[in-house]
């Protein structure tokens, strides 16, 4: 009997195709059903150039993807902290020490800040590597497809070096105008305070680190106002490139004025 943890070890560290099939059947009831869910999930992640036909990565004329799509998948995988120990393990064992697992991705033991993800090889796709690393609060992901056995590591290392040397994380700062309360009509208070629903660091070029916030707000809102109500949005730009957008929400309620008051 193998646990889910053992199966994940086998797949992530040892590239075990049989374990991938077992996990697929356990999650979806059958491999075909799992493949359908894989494709639906891939589409949700924005992997619009990807079609999966099996969970193992076997060569198939109908199966295809791109380096950009795989980078999107890795970006999502990086959010699952429970997977990090598997991605970061170079060598492990199953069934006591009966089965040895050795990670084909040598970055798992050699690259500073390594967080994942996968080294693989098939006849049609060649030697591939999807790698991610975090340094100084910034995560970079690089993907090389159809490379050679050794050159894929050199290429990915060069891509990551470029990412860490040319970009940095910047925290958005808001002007006094942003913090100015919004007018409320018909309420017990004449204004309401608001904030951005989701504010986090953004990656910008070190050479051009300018970051601007563009607000979309009405001139006023009508009472009553609930706490957490969406009243607009703010978009963060680096030059002409929008990095991300989030809602503006109220931080307090405002009751409507009544005749009794």
Which residues make up each language-model segment?
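Active-site-adjacent loops and short helices of periplasmic peptidoglycan-processing enzymes
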Residues: 1-68, 72-81
């Amino acid at each position: 009997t193998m646990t889910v943890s053992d199966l994940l070890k086998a797949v992530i560290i040892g590239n075990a195709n049989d374990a991938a099939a077992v996990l697929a059947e356990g999650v979806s009831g059958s491999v075909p059903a799992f493949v359908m869910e894989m494709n639906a999930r891939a589409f949700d992640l924005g992997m619009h150039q990807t079609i999966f036909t099996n969970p193992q990565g076997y060569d198939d004329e109908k199966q295809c993807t791109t380096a950009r799509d795989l980078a999107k998948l890795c970006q999502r995988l990086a959010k699952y902290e429970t997977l990090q120990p598997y991605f970061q393990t170079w060598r492990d064992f199953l069934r006591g020490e009966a089965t040895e697992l050795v990670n084909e991705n040598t970055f798992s033991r050699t690259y500073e800040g390594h967080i994942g993800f996968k080294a693989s090889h098939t006849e049609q796709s060649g030697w591939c590597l999807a790698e991610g690393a975090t340094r100084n609060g910034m995560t970079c992901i690089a993907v090389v497809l159809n490379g050679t056995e050794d050159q894929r590591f050199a290429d990915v290392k060069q891509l990551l070096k470029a990412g860490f040397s040319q970009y940095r994380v910047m925290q958005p700062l808001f002007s006094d105008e942003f913090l100015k309360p919004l007018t409320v009509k018909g309420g017990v208070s004449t204004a309401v305070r608001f904030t951005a629903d989701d504010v986090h660091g953004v990656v910008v070029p070190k050479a051009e680190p300018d970051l601007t916030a563009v607000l979309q707000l009405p001139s006023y809102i009508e009472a009553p106002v609930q706490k957490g109500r969406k009243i607009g949005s703010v978009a963060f730009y680096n030059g002409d490139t929008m990095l991300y957008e989030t809602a503006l929400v109220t931080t307090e309620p405002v009751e409507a004025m009544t005749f009794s008051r």
